[in-house]
Amino acid sequence: MKFIRAKSISYGSVRSYEDVKAICIHFTGISNDTAENEGNYFAHGNTRAAGAHIFSDRAGNNVKSVPLSRPAWSVGIFFTRAGGAAKYWGTLNNYNTVSIEMCDCATKDPSKKQIKAIKKAIKYIRKKCPNATKVVRHFDICGKQCPGRMSGGPGTKGYERWQKLLRDLGELPEQKTKKKAVKKAKKAAAKTSKTSKTNKEIAKEVIAGKWGNGKIRKQRLTAAGYDYDTIQRIVNNMLK
């Protein structure tokens, strides 16, 4: 990811990566801008206390503008709670969020390449900030109409657009729950494959006396998930 460091007016002092709790999505509100354009502006032209960590554009480019170890001045001004806005006001702020700005989305939805870039940015952020589990809007923190066409509470067109973006990013709660379940299952399967042995290997251990005799052997094999009769049949064949 290209890094064009913003002027120091755009961010605050060093913070811990572990303090970051959420990723906030914004839009620049500008048409035809690119991630590099925005990076250069905040590096050389910006004159106010405003900034964002990463800019993502329609071509699929990400440009980092503010180090993740610094709070960008991006969600500090309260606007309104009307229409379901600002539900995280007082909980999320500049110091515990990382901000991603979507370029050229003032009048249109993000492109497929842009969505892919945002997913990459989120993955990059979470590698450094493992507690950044939420993905929210500027609207959800401060009540600002940002990211523009995706602003609004449940039942609005903006909310529908926001839910679609979350779905495209794989960030809906049910998607994340499913991901966790799949990851857990894969981990369990990998563990089983590493620790389990073939019936023939177990039969050899039985012959070597490692599983005991009689009822004790049967109990141990069954408890370990092996079919006693199958193992015993292999043992008998080996001893012929």
Where are these regions (language model features)?
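Active-site-adjacent loop/helix surface patches within enzyme catalytic domains
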Residues: 1-131
